[in-house]
From Swiss-Prot:
It comes from the Eukaryota. The gene is matK. Coiled coil: none annotated. The keyword tRNA processing applies. This is Maturase K. Its main location: plastid. GO terms for cellular component: chloroplast. GO terms for biological process: mRNA processing; RNA splicing; tRNA processing. Keywords: Chloroplast, mRNA processing, Plastid, RNA-binding, tRNA processing. The lineage of its organism: Eukaryota, Viridiplantae, Streptophyta, Embryophyta, Tracheophyta. It is found in: Plastid, Chloroplast. Usually encoded in the trnK tRNA gene intron. Probably assists in splicing its own and other chloroplast group II introns. The keyword tRNA processing applies.
């Protein structure tokens, strides 16, 4: 039992250095600002951001050094003269820098872990597309999945208490508590409805970091159960004794942490080694080769785990048991499913010929065209029916700037949805963006589309027709010698680290 407790509290006894003094360092805000722009895939050009200029950061740090200017009132933050005067300005810069600071201890642990395991090219594993080869290799063999909507804490104080195990700096925790209570909102941060302002973007990163730290607490229990049970498949005498001892430890673990009274009657709950867990945003997927009864046991276990150990009210109706053969998963902007691919094999023995019908399971990924068109309509690129329109807010920009913005949007969407099994939906999205670009340019020059194209020529839109730039990728289908064959195959890129706002339909 002591061994299990030490595992669940791994590295929590290690005190971290104080992080609060880093808030007063100028280079922290420079790093945070550069990281936000370098990882951005938004349609806007970064340009010059006066809200993050060095002069403003110096003025901000000077005001924080002044006495009684950085006091936090628990009841009303408007009483604070520091935030009351420049709330919409300083409150955007400080959370961005503070989010960069609190990630430092976790980044150091991640680097040391990758170096210890000698993982080569670990940056490729950060790509969102790297998860799809895993689904291709494993999901076609599974039968059922648990589609889970992860519950969130009823109060942000639960999130702060989670980080107390890792951060021993009381000042940083108090400042974190202030930011969470003042600026964060569950609905707008976890499930953003649309691409918000820079204010929401800056505060969202801090909130998501704290939220993911909280979710990791109960995910670590899953990892422990999975890693221990996966090594108990041998039937040798030594491992058999270890297996019996492990099941005994599991009963005590669940009785202490989860309080499942009937766990002894369901020992098969953790004996299934072929299980896979995936989480994205507020959803998670638990796939297995087991039966429907086995998945119902896991459903009851998850509900009890959250309610008893993590004090989270969770309704069983938030967990759906779906059969992969009859259900599609809305996963990271794709509709993923496992469909049967029928084939006929002709076999001949001497003078007798036979036709054998064979069906092979195939992992399929499609682009949901309707939600994507709705996202383009909200961004004012087209109507709700998919008819391209002009972008009035960009009409005052230069022609090259307008074309560059549309080109980057088209390139980002093409890269992100390059793994689609069919390219028809992608062709339609490119058509909408191209015609929207032409209409925007025609609106700027106060001409019709036909007149504008006749005077400008086809060279103006050649940016859209240029081939994609070379980036690392891999495909699932057999390679072709022609570009046409490569374009028809599914391509997964290794340089995509965040979901495009237009592809995020939630």
């Amino acid at each position: 039992m002591e061994e299990i407790k030490r595992y669940l509290q791994r590295n929590r006894s290690h005190h971290q250095d104080f992080l609060y003094p880093l808030i007063f360092q100028e280079y922290i805000y420079a790093f945070a600002h550069y990281r936000g722009f370098s990882q951005s895939i938004l349609s806007e050009n970064p340009g010059y951001d006066n809200k993050s200029s060095l002069l403003l950061v110096k003025r901000l740090i000077t005001r924080m050094y002044q006495q009684n200017h950085f006091l936090i009132f628990p009841n009303d933050s408007n009483q604070n003269p520091f935030f009351a005067r420049n709330k919409n300005l300083y409150s955007q810069i400080i959370p961005e820098g503070f989010a960069f600071i609190v990630e430092i201890p976790f980044s150091l642990r991640l680097i040391s872990c990758l170096e210890g395991k000698k993982i080569v090219k670990s940056q490729n594993l950060r790509s969102i597309h790297s998860i799809f080869p895993f689904l291709e290799n494993n999901f076609s063999h599974f039968h059922f999945v648990l589609d889970v909507l992860i519950p969130h804490p009823v109060h942000v104080e639960i999130l702060v208490q989670t980080l107390r195990y890792w951060l021993k700096d009381a000042s940083s925790l108090h400042l974190l508590r202030f930011f969470l209570n003042e600026y964060c909102n569950w609905n707008s941060c976890i499930l953003p409805k649309k691409a918000g302002s820079s204010f929401s973007k800056r505060t969202q990163r801090l909130f998501l970091f704290v939220y993911n730290s909280h979710v990791w607490e109960y995910e670590s229990i899953f990892v422990f159960l999975r890693n221990q049970s996966a090594h108990l498949r041998s039937i040798s005498s030594g491992v058999l004794l270890e297996r019996i001892y492990f099941y005994g430890k599991m009963e005590r673990l669940v009785n202490v942490f989860v309080k499942v009274k009937d766990f002894r009657s369901n020992p098969g709950l953790i004996k299934e080694p072929c299980m896979h867990y995936i989480r994205y945003q507020r959803k998670s997927i638990l796939a297995s080769k087991g039966t429907s009864l086995f998945m119902n046991k896991w459903k009851c276990y998850l509900v009890t785990l959250w309610q008893w150990h993590f004090s989270l009210w969770f309704h069983p109706r938030r967990i759906y048991i779906n059969q992969l053969a009859n259900h599609s998963l809305e996963f990271l902007g794709y509709l993923s499913s496992v469909r049967m691919n029928p084939s006929v094999i002709r076999s001949q023995i001497l003078e007798n010929a036979f036709l054998i019908n064979n069906a092979i399971k195939k992992f399929d990924t499609l682009v949901p065209i309707i939600p994507l068109i709705m996202s383009l309509a909200k961004a004012q690129f087209c109507t709700v029916l998919g008819h391209p329109i002009s972008k009035p807010v960009w009409a005052d920009l230069s022609d090259s700037n307008i074309i560059d913005r549309f080109r980057r949007i088209s390139r980002n969407l093409s890269h992100y949805h390059s793994g689609s099994s069919t390219k028809k939906s992608l062709y339609r999205i490119k058509y909408i963006l191209r015609l929207s670009c032409v209409r925007t340019l025609a609106r700027k020059h106060k001409r019709t589309v036909c007149v504008f194209l006749k005077r400008s020529g086809s060279e103006l839109l050649e940016e859209f027709l240029m081939s994609e730039e070379g980036v690392p990728f891999f495909t699932f289908q057999k390679g072709f010698s022609t570009l046409r064959g490569i374009y028809r195959s599914r391509v997964w890129y290794l340089d995509i680290f965040s979901i495009n706002d237009l592809a995020n339909h939630k």
